[in-house]
Amino acid sequence: MKAKGIYFVDVALLLVAVATCLTGVFLHKAGHFNTHEVWHNWAVAHIVSSVLMLLFGALHIYAHLGWYKSLLKGKTKGKSIITLMLSVLFVVVTMTGVVMLAMTFVPNTGVGLWHYVFGLALSVASIAHIVLRWQQLLKLKSAIR
């Protein structure tokens, strides 16, 4: 993937990650304090933003496939632990989200709480990942001008 494509994917992923995080928090809150209709609206918004996050997340991983290959060869360094944690959390949150969608006929399972807790952890790891790589994103932006 060329620099312009990587930059577009990274910015899009950042935007949908924020949307996914916010809709997830509002969805959780709506489950405690609002009507089913309000909860349902937040659920739809969260699912749409999550599907977009999955799409742009997959493109982001594809663009940085070299990092995963070097990880398997034991040649990563520095900021790798945050990226590894982020990757694992992304998989866990995605899996618990899919399980919850498959279990819509079973209300009040513990999976929802796990999804929420791991989602918050994913948000923290994402912020750390973005902060550690912010300068790289800015360099990429200036390189495509």
Regions found by a protein language model. Give the residues of each.
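Membrane-embedded alpha-helical bundles that constitute the cytochrome b-like, heme-associated redox core
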Residues: 1-145
